[in-house]
């Protein structure tokens, strides 16, 4: 395997080089990193992304998605590969052994997302976006984030989604559940009876539709937030993809909560 990769590298003329200019051929192995490259204005450098990235249809997709084989990446002749914490260690090692500049970004928290954005801005010699605050808005309204009005999937401690709720001035009841991405039971929701329900929307739904769904639910119809209409519909991307949208989500969510 290693011999075949080295031979392919030789044929493509891939050799270690000093980084004297911003990268011109970039492969992104994660949707959030693709979003970051676009946000700083360097999208023209992308030569391939994962099938899960929001990118033009004519932009090549990396075979294997977010966990590709090194040969597939090497064949794209990149001068920079952007990888995440889930990129296989073997792939990272092989790419680096072949002299391909490979940067790994950890984005589990809002602070890490901001650090990644600043690092990418430096790499591409772009201006970093203005910082937003991660601090809590200082209120104590309890809330729950649900990935769908009829599911129990939520976000707990140790996730950037939890930090978004905190930045919006909300106390996340799922922080008391087990694990960073818990499945909340109906009894848990009834006992906690959150003041606000935030529904992560993947597109197409509006508040009235989701409220109607919640009010037909045999258990959730009894939640005070449902009876009183204290439901916020918010784009799911901010909670599910730790990228630029997450950094501004706290302020935007707080504004929506204040309208209730």
Regions found by a protein language model. Name each.
Residues 4-15:
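Bacterial N-terminal signal peptides
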Residues 24-86, 133, 170-173, 220:
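A short, structured surface patch at a secondary-structure boundary
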Residues 65, 69-86, 100, 185-202:
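Proline-aspartate-enriched helix->loop->beta-strand connector
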Residues 22-37, 123-168:
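Basic- and aromatic-lined ligand-binding clefts that recognize polyanionic substrates
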Residues 24, 110-125, 138, 203-260:
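Structured C-terminal subdomain patch of bacterial secreted/periplasmic proteins
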Residues 50, 158-181, 201:
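His/Asp/Glu-enriched short active-site or ligand-binding loop at hydrolase and phosphoryl-transfer sites
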Residues 30, 85-86, 147-150, 177, ...:
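Short secondary-structure boundary segments
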Residues 18-20:
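Boundary at the C-terminal end of the N-terminal hydrophobic targeting segment
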